[in-house]
A protein has these predicted regions:
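Flavin-dependent oxidoreductase catalytic cores
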Residues: 1-396
Length: 396
């Protein structure tokens, strides 16, 4: 019988167990987007903690796709390959596979960060990130982005990564192409689900020509809260399209940034938001008492929610044969066991539990602990805008 600690494989890559560290922006790259010694040590700690596999924080494939969050990884130049090789070799010492998540942030960045205009499939301003209306991408610009993704995949392979993960969720560029909420084009890149998927299909086709059977995973939304966003019915189509395009595994997440994701659960850290968020710092403090209830109502769940992507993952797993990874509000070992044993998913992924406890998998396996120590204070999610990720444990 399958369980959370049974060995398994993704595209032939052996995992010691079925618990994966989901991509988490650490904010620990250097000024050029190379991994630093501090970041490598964090990944070593995860590997020592016997995690099944690591998916890195997101790495941008080109300069205009760089995140406004502090010290993002970049995979935009060949000169970066040796830095990543060092990272991979250090992690592989502990027999832990590591996948590089690659992305383009699209409209979820600032021109002052990238030094270039922000871009998107459609000229629709992001409510949280973008101070300007993004430039609508032309055919030639889309083709250049496709090329950059493919080259990034080649670089990841040369660096020794066990595979890559395409970031198709959370409102970044590829996510915004997939979502009818953000993609209002009426050409071959917009309209139908097939057209909105076209950019991903082209990346996969061209990547397969270059790297053949090199593992390519994807992270996608099972749903979006926006009325005209992706819903489960369309997510099923996207998942099937990914499988047809020779994707090797799919991680199920949800939401986009301007919806507040569903990440703010439980405590609403308004003081932290006021201190770190770029929009709040532009507002007079006298307005804070009026702003707080509006933000809390719009972006936060009134109480912690757990396993909030499981229903989507269950339905998607019924429709495809490639492995399904579920992330989102997983805190208890019992839940991880149940999801795997009931074959509701093939792997489970976590982020915040690894921020507070990099060795949580080992503790679970040795029966020293049954639940993450994460208290869902949400400070880590807010603080990462200006400082490297860490656990605040409810204290600023």
């Amino acid at each position: 019988m399958k369980d959370a600690f049974s060995e398994s494989k993704i595209a032939g890559i052996k995992l010691r167990n079925r618990i994966i560290r989901s991509a988490t922006h650490e904010g620990l790259a250097d000024d050029f987007g190379n991994p630093t010694e501090e970041l490598i040590k964090k990944y070593e700690d995860l590997a020592k903690g016997e995690v099944g596999a690591i998916i890195t924080g997101y790495a941008a494939v080109m300069q205009n796709g760089k995140s406004p969050l502090i010290n993002m990884l970049m995979i935009d130049k060949d000169e970066k390959i040796p830095y990543y090789t060092e990272l991979v070799d250090r992690v592989h010492q502990y027999n832990t596979p590591i996948f590089l998540q690659i992305t383009h942030c699209g409209r979820q960045t600032f021109s002052r960060t990238t030094g270039m205009p922000t871009v998107a499939p459609s000229p629709i301003k992001d409510k949280l990130y973008n101070e300007d209306i993004p430039h609508e991408l032309t055919d030639s610009e889309i083709d250049e982005i496709i090329k950059c993704f493919v080259i990034a995949i080649e670089r990841a392979k040369k660096a020794g990564f066990d595979g890559v993960q395409l970031q198709l969720s959370h409102g970044y560029l590829l996510s915004s192409f997939l979502s009818p909420h953000m993609n209002k084009r009426n050409d071959k890149w917009g309209g139908s689900t097939e057209n909105r998927f076209r950019i991903v299909k082209k990346i996969m086709e061209r990547a397969r020509e270059k790297v053949v059977d090199y593992p390519i995973l994807a992270k996608m939304n099972g749903y979006e809260k926006s009325k005209d966003g992706i819903k489960l019915e369309e997510a099923l189509i996207i998942a099937r399209n990914l499988e047809k395009a020779s994707c090797d595994a799919i991680e199920i997440s949800c939401g986009i940034a301007e919806e507040g994701f569903v990440g703010i659960r439980g405590e609403f850290p308004f003081d932290m938001i006021a201190q770190h968020n770029h929009l709040m710092q532009k507002m007079p403090k006298i307005l804070y008492p009026f702003i707080k209830p509006v933000l809390k109502h719009s972006f936060a769940s009134p109480e912690p929610r757990y396993l909030y992507n499981l229903d989507s993952a269950i339905e998607i797993k019924k429709n495809i044969k490639i492995p399904v990874i579920v992330v989102g509000g997983i805190r208890k070992l019992e839940d991880a066991y149940n999801m795997i044993q009931r074959e509701q998913c093939d792997f489970i992924a976590m982020s915040r539990p690894f921020i507070i406890e990099p060795t949580i998998v080992k503790k679970f396996k040795e029966n020293k602990q049954q639940q993450s120590k994460c208290i869902d204070c949400n400070y880590c999610q807010i603080g990462v805008e200006k400082t490297p990720v860490k656990c605040y444990y409810g204290k600023m």
